[in-house]
Amino acid sequence: MNKRKVLVIGWDAADWKAIDPLMDQGLMPNLERMVNSGVRGRMATLDPPLSPMLWTSIATGKRPYKHGILGFTEVGPDGKTVRPVTNVHRKVKAIWNILTQEGAKSHVVGWWPSHPAEPINGIMVSNFYQRANRPMNEPWVMRKGTVHPEKMSAHFGALRIHPAELTAAHIAPFVPDFANVDQGKEKSLESLARIIADCSTVQAAGTWILEHEPW
């Protein structure tokens, strides 16, 4: 097993202007320890700052006009409809393709966009993995192509967390006064629950891989 390892965590829209006050209040001790024992800096972004475009630029080292991912949506196969962006239109290799080509191991979880999962030397769990698209009482079927290798789909499917599984203990740290929110009029708690469930699902898959797979 290679002792020299790199872990890249994508934190969409993270800004030191928001993070520094939280660290100063002692609310992000783990990140604060990483900052104090390492190096930090500000990244220049691209314009317009569209997440799939930026994430693909990071993964490929190319600008959008070269890598081909330009926004949140793309034209469907029929040429008439619009669908959430996938990696189908990416024109160049991502870092995980290059590592596979060189015989190195890599794992990818939830990178945007990474669907359909690519046959890399490792595990890839696409960004279509975490979002619950059905009510809790209906089957939560994983879309084909979400996991590589495909034989691990059932395993990772069992790690997913549905927003309806969250309890008050999960919501209270973010909205202490959540009990007084009129959810009939205000949908922000519902949106927050989806975000927490999505992030927790990605975290569950990522930490399982770190613990059980060579990297």
What positions do the PLM features span?
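Short phosphate-engaging motifs
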Residues: 15, 30, 50, 65, ...
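Short, structured active-site-proximal loop/turn typified by the sulfatase FGly-forming signature C/S-X-P-X-R
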Residues: 19-57, 62, 105-107
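His/Asp/Glu-rich, glycine-adjacent segments
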Residues: 63-215
